[in-house]
Amino acid sequence: MGQDSIVIKGAREHNLKNIDVTIPRDKLVVITGLSGSGKSSLAFDTIYAEGQRRYVESLSSYARMFLGQMDKPDLDSIDGLSPAVSIDQKTTSKNPRSTVGTTTEIYDYLRLLFARTGIPHCPECGKEIKSQTTDQVADEILALGNGETTKAMIMAPVVTGRKGEFTKLFADLAKEGFVRVRIDGEVRKLDGEPLTLNKKIKHFIDVVVDRVVLKSSATSRIAEAVEKATSLADGRVLVQVLGESSTEAQSSYTSSGATGGLAENEHVYSLALACPEHGHSIDELQPRDFSFNAPYGACPECLGIGTSEEVNESLVVPDPSLSISEGCLVPFSTGNYYPQVMKALCKHLKISDKTPWEDLPTKAKRAIMDGTGDEKIRVDYLTVSGRETYWFITWEGARAAIIQRRDEASSDKQREKLNAYFSQHPCPACKGKRLKPEILAVTVGGKSINEVTALSARESLEFFQSLEFTGQNRTIAQPIVKEIIARLQFLVDVGLDYLTLDRATASLSGGEAQRIRLATQIGAGLMGVLYILDEPSIGLHQRDNDRLIATLEHLRDLGNTVIVVEHDEDTIRSADYVIDMGPGAGENGGYLVAAGTPEQIQNAGSASITADYLSGRRKIEVPATRRQPQKGYISLTGAQVNNLKNVSVDIPLGTFCVVTGVSGSGKSSLITDTLALALANRVNHAHKTAAPYKKLTGVEAIDKVINIDQSPIGRTPRSNPATYIGLWDDLRALYASTNEAKARGYAPGRFSFNVSGGRCEACKGDGQIKIEMHFLPDIYVPCEVCGGSRYNRETLQVTYRGKNIAQLLDMTVEEALAFFQNIPGIARKLQTLFDVGLGYIRLGQPATTLSGGEAQRVKLASELQRKQTGKTFYILDEPTTGLHFEDVRQLLSVLQRLVDSGNTVLVIEHNLDVIKSADYIIDMGPEGGDRGGKVIAHGTPEQIVKANVGYTGKYIAKML
């Protein structure tokens, strides 16, 4: 049994109820169930944690110190485990150096290919750079002759565009027996009158080594002259073909071939890897030269990042209709010092501080932004205490002042505030290409490494499939190209054919990042591994789902066990084995409701909500009517970031509007990067850099824009759902109002674990202590003083209805809702969390443990409790992430409730149940990447189906 199955006995991690589970090995297994039913507790916190822990324990203590310590999960036993690999959505690299190419290791193979088979070119003239032997150069010179009478002058270009008199050079050359030199195109004798040159201008000096007739009998003489010339001129030789006349041609050309276009009868050769014309030399190529993370090839200006940071004037002056006295220069508009400096600066520049910024002379604006040089400016200053004084300053400019303030900021908060005035620009030296010019001039198949990485995965695949090599290069390139093609094919197979290899991983969505790691794992070709994935279908259009499922099956067919936590119906139906957790969430979950093949699950009893949806006993109904646009439109014109093709779009107000389209079609570029930021700037008076667009109209009909994204609600374990939705203040006030607290004189602050007073001082309110293990990983143990409760004994003695503050934090939202049902203010906030499907999370659950989808729904709950004006514009990006069919139904009712109140809800979504429930659909496409970026259809779901363009209509036709 242990050989063909993973057998788990008595799993009790988190909310698991001492369950026994048997999972077949080498199969595709889907774990499904409601949010909070225990899926991740079983897959990640039990199976993966134990598999990883056992593997790490088998290593030496030295190796273990570099790996994270994992606690033993709470279970009786687990047999049949393999080494486990987890592919989740939280571990995306935010390093600006990490790209799709580096993550998938394709870039490593590209570096090897370019180093071994790349053809170097001169970055200036584009000519191929080749190293040649003396004999090869001699043969090429010989080939310049037209018969037995053609003569040539062989020269050594010793000075190429340098200033000076070169008296010593001429003396040394004469001593060595040379008779003639060509100076700036004119041949002069060394043994005649002393040569005097103007030391203030650049000169070109070529030593005449020999004059020969280009005939085969002179081969050894030519080779000898080449050898002599190259020894004088760092491996270079200049040849002037003289024709049949014995007289020396006086070239009007004033270069020895070092700075540009040679005369027709002149030729330069090089023994080294260097451009004979421009002198650009290159060492023998190594893979490290093509790495933007190594100093050998990285652009010296940006050190390989490709961008430089600059203070952006439009962020410093977000509203140019304001004057300086009205605070148009936002970072200099508050406090006592800077407003007075600005006033003095205006006086010095002879401009009025009452004039709107947009009406100020350009010269004055430049002086304010970039400084007034060494000019002394008198500042008449009134201190806070009312004392008048003055002094003189030099003004370095607003940009320099902001940079200095950021560099000297004493807190992260202050630094973050000043960071808001900076924007990224392509590095002016490398134009964002990250590498040195001579490395960018190396080509394979006519493309530089930068041009190859700028291709999408699909285009790159086509490029390498059509690439041909000859001779020795074919033998070298074949195995490298094979690996590159295989990895590119995996990217295409997981639906990421639109991503370019130079795309930063920090800019990828959770689903995209996870599928990239999935492609990397397939590329590794391991067998006998246990892979655990967390919703790989996130962000994937139904069209791409079949390819993803085929990829998972391929991973299984290699001989691996693939466990997927998933809600997607197609994936569930494609599984070899399904485990359904439930029946409810939180304390009501943690049981194994059903297990078996998809067909067996479908016929499971009424306890399985999944079975009800798979069999069709339950379903999300199509709305009986669609809301008609009656409140006007938000109209965005001319959006053109990333792959958007000058897109214009109308969003009907007062409706539930869904933006759809295949992955990479431009949905996020249009909504997240352009519309959301443009609306925030216009309506919320934010200072954000929206992507380029021409016009935005209709904003007067809304009074607030709320973009509910999946970023964390807090970056530390001290932040939790209760603090985020404003419930924590109510709870602390409630405990402070109890008779016991009043008798002891406790204020609400006593019940905070962030400040001293009521918290446990042994662990500073963390509930755990970090123990440094030196060469072993640091371990965290519950605080012995407070037992992990975070509070001191006196604080915990204050109770409300028998529960102290620590016990309250440990309650789930559902439990707390029943507990506080008679306190409307608290119950209302808890109800919003429950309504968005978060009844299972604990009030004190650290923000760092919430998934992106959970964090997004906490934010949605926070918005739901605010007073509705009916004029709010909500934007959500894939809110169904991590949601079961039943959770989606619950979420839809919440979103429809917002629209019923008169608000507008705009959602980017792939879930067909959400799409079919929309009042209005905007479908992007037709494909991803360069083949997308257009609005291909818009209207009600029925109209999208009727339009019969793109893929979305085909899939929702089955749902209506």
Where are these regions (language model features)?
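Conserved phosphate-binding elements of NTP-dependent enzyme cores
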Residues: 1-960
